[in-house]
Amino acid sequence: MPVSAKDRAPASTHKKVVVLLLDRTPIKGYVIPGTLGHEESIDLLTPDGEHRSIPLPSVKCVYFVREFQTPFQPERKIFLSRPKLDGLWVRLRFRDEDVMEGLVGNDLLDLLDTGVQITPPDLHGNSLRIFIPRSALEEMKVLGVVGAARRTSQELRGVSSSQSKLFSE
């Protein structure tokens, strides 16, 4: 007998992450992604069931991972060629002079939080997304806009076809 959608157990809102501290100590656990960047600390549930609160200024990156057993840091930290996914192609320079590239959504409101979420260059690696607190960054540069729709020549001119001509023949 099929189970209706309202009787089904809700999908887990906790995602697997590895929190990398500024001193390069990794901490594995689960977080609720919607709270990242909105609070002064990260609430982490460890695999042992222990609750930890990690202050955001001590965090370098939060890696959303597929598995805890495989390496969490991307094999490649920069794109080998122009990315194919839509978004802003950015280069991040951390306070410890480490450099990483990634893609952020093409919505500037996403960049106003206390951190930024990027898609790493290694799409087939263990890290699906990376959250970087603003306090861990020294610099963030936009290298390009990928997938933006080109404006037509009529939009560039701003001339409407229904607009009357000044001198008609």
Per-region residue spans from a language model:
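Conserved RNA-binding domains used in RNP assembly and mRNA/RNA metabolism
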Residues: 1-169
